Amino acid sequence: MAELTIRPEEIRDALENFVQSYKPDAASREEVGTVTVAGDGIAKVEGLPSAMANELLKFEDGTLGLALNLEEREIGAVVLGEFSGIEEGQPVHRTGEVLSVAVGEGYLGRVVDPLGNPIDGLGEIETSGRRALELQAPTVMDRKSVHEPMETGYKAVDAMTPIGRGQRQLIIGDRQTGKTALAVDTIINQRDNWRTGDPKKQVRCIYVAIGQKGSTIASVRGALEEAGALEYTTIVAAPASDPAGFKYLAPYTGSAIGQQWMYEGKHVLIIFDDLSKQADAYRAVSLLLRRPPGREAYPGDVFYLHSRLLERCAKLSDDMGAGSMTGLPIVETKANDVSAFIPTNVISITDGQCFLESDLFNAGQRPALNVGISVSRVGGSAQHKAMRQVSGRLRVDLAQFRELEAFAAFGSDLDAASKSQLERGQRMVELLKQAQYQPMPTEDQVVSVWAGTTGKMDDVPVADIRRFEKELLEFLHRKYQGLMTSIKEGAKMSDDTLTAIADAIADFKKQFETSDGKLLGEDVPAAGK
């Protein structure tokens, strides 16, 4: 056997080759921390001195956590997912990434969790990139004033508190007053715009469900699917059974998905249902992380929680692509108290509010819109021109009717003018009622409101008002289609158009039969009665 000899030159050459081929970036330094406290959806971690605010941390079982509290010796993290497998002493790794969500057209028609993962069993989602959840809202110079209408399909809202694309309009009221129904109907009302295929008309919708029952979210999805509205809607679901961290993050996830479309020059409608539950979840997380409580035990930055979310809704300037994101945040009140902490915060952030009152709802007035304290601060300039023309006096007339109604309750004798105003008010209240999941096209709303405010329905019995309206609109679409199309196109109505509408209504009245068997304008019973 030959003797093994190693020459010094060979050792030197091998070392030189290794040193020359060494790449410093191939080596990595990883920080590993340790869980010191775990439970109730939060974890405290030691040993990660370089962690960033809002950085994702990875626990031993693969669950992610979000670094919220950066203290001198430890990090307070909220666990994003099931926390039962996280125990003291387990290692925690940094990911080097801040929280982000995948975005893209593939989200339309899907139900996802607050991390953007599909939960509807329809397979993976095709995405076009990722977007950070904590992004700066558009600056003042990036914005443009609101000037395009975002119709809800409700006469009461579109006539008296109009909403424009890029506006933030709060929907506020007690539980079970129709807040979600108003929001869902607004999504359904975008169906005709979507079917035009025109990107300038199409609206992509996002429904963020926070802290609701799973059955409620399923029923909303079913209603949208049945109405043909799911194809342009994304549902971000954080049901009541989810950890508080998911409920806190869900609105930001929906907003990030919507912002991507907005910056691509598209129009977006996002509904947060509801922000009261998000604030409750944030309060729970903050108290568990030992942050100092403030009013109603909410942390000091709860205003910033909602302001940085809602400021992302905007109408972008032409240079930025002219896209828009319209926000409809929902807030629940207790006993119609709009002066509580969260309601006043969100009212001060938004551009107006629709206040739905439980007394009106229980009296059969649906939508239960309280005209007195509902307002739209910027939507007037975006309102459909024909609607603005016919709805000018509607708010004042209804407010006067409510006062007169309260006065008449004392049984005082009223003069003829007051009686006439009271009777017309009763008809207008009846006219503004609408069934759920039946939004009305703009041209139908214009005719209906004009007929009511100008007294064209004064001779129709109150009990027949809704049937009269339904049959009148069917008659107009059948025999006066050109007239309805001209109203829809958005121009202010000329005197000739108004005369044509009045003639058409008079024409219809000749054949309308009231519930007591009379033809309008005649005192004799209809034939066969």
Swiss-Prot record:
The disulfide bridges present are: none
The site annotation (Required for activity) covers 374
Instruction: List the catalytic activities from the record.
Output: ATP + H2O + 4 H(+)(in) = ADP + phosphate + 5 H(+)(out)
Query: What GO CC terms are in its UniProt record?
Result: plasma membrane; proton-transporting ATP synthase complex
- Judging by the UniProt lineage, the source's domain of life is Bacteria
Q: Care to name a GO molecular-function term for this sequence?
A: ATP binding
Keywords assigned by UniProt? ATP synthesis, ATP-binding, Cell membrane, CF(1), Hydrogen ion transport, Ion transport, Membrane, Nucleotide-binding, Translocase, Transport
Broadest EC class?
translocase
Q: Where does ATP bind?
A: 173-180
Q: Quote the PROSITE patterns the UniProt record gives.
A: ATPASE_ALPHA_BETA
Catalytic activity, EC: 7.1.2.2
Q: By its UniProt entry, which InterPro entries does this protein fall under? A: ATP_synth_asu-like_sf (IPR023366), ATP_synth_asu_C (IPR000793), ATP_synth_asu_C_sf (IPR038376), ATP_synth_F1_a_nt-bd_dom (IPR033732), ATP_synth_F1_asu (IPR005294), ATPase_a/bsu_AS (IPR020003), ATPase_F1/V1/A1_a/bsu_N (IPR004100), ATPase_F1/V1/A1_a/bsu_N_sf (IPR036121)
Query: How does this chain sit within the bilayer?
Result: Peripheral membrane protein
Q: Provide the protein's localization.
A: Cell membrane
What HAMAP family does this protein map onto? ATP_synth_alpha_bact (MF_01346)
The record's subunit annotation is: F-type ATPases have 2 components, CF(1) - the catalytic core - and CF(0) - the membrane proton channel. CF(1) has five subunits: alpha(3), beta(3), gamma(1), delta(1), epsilon(1). CF(0) has three main subunits: a(1), b(2) and c(9-12). The alpha and beta chains form an alternating ring which encloses part of the gamma chain. CF(1) is attached to CF(0) by a central stalk formed by the gamma and epsilon chains, while a peripheral stalk is formed by the delta and b chains.
What family is reported? Belongs to the ATPase alpha/beta chains family.
Biological role: Produces ATP from ADP in the presence of a proton gradient across the membrane. The alpha chain is a regulatory subunit.
Q: What is this protein called?
A: ATP synthase subunit alpha
Q: Which organism is it from?
A: Streptomyces avermitilis (strain ATCC 31267 / DSM 46492 / JCM 5070 / NBRC 14893 / NCIMB 12804 / NRRL 8165 / MA-4680)
Provide the organism lineage as a comma list: Bacteria, Bacillati, Actinomycetota, Actinomycetes, Kitasatosporales
